[in-house]
Amino acid sequence: KEGSQINWILGERSNGKSYQVKHKKGILRYWCDGVNYHANYKNKNEVIEECIKTKTRRFGLIRRLQEEIKPSVALNYFSDIDVYKITDGKYNTFDIYRERVYLANYDMDTHKTKRGEFIGYLVALSIEQNYAGGSFLDITDLVFEEVITRKIYLKNEPSKLLNLFCTVDRKRGTTRLWLPGNTISRVCPYFEEWGMDTLMRNIKQGDIKSVWIPTGEVDEDGVPVEVKMSVEYCKSTGRSSFVIGKHSE
């Protein structure tokens, strides 16, 4: 909504933050690109088929620890998504193989899963340095669940997250980082290290505030690279009231 590369979405539990982010910035962004860019095709099925052939966008799901990206754990994240409905019956489940997320089909008779479209990556923040030499130019959106936690944060965690973000974006300015979180505490290492203390003290429900933060990198002219960061404090209502933008943006 603000055109920011780093986007906090804060609010009470169970108000739809995570659900909307994983749909709009993960599954739907990948699957429905064809609806926007191939509208000249005759029908929805043709659009989807063409979309499958031409997809280049993927998401990255960030977890704090390595054990959280194991298939048995990570698959729970997608358990509330109706894959069959979204894909018009083409797929009925997800599969994770070598830290990659796939649309897939599970056969009730053979009890086997057949992988289909590769749609996203799983990454562990605790080992962000391991990704430094990799290429993730197909990632358009990064999502870090439970960025605010009652548990223990990693040492230098805000710096690790910025390093990971820079590894993926490669100074292209095209990657978006989504940080849905519950406002269970305003004491958070990110708020201090990213200069958000004043913003968090003054922000009110329904507000969206933006600041610029340094990434620690410099451009080819030696000028420090900054990214725009926005914080949305969702209204407290019985239903989701925040807007994170259309999935096609």
Give the ranges of each region predicted by the language model.
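Phosphate/NTP-binding elements of NTP-utilizing enzymes
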Residues: 1-249
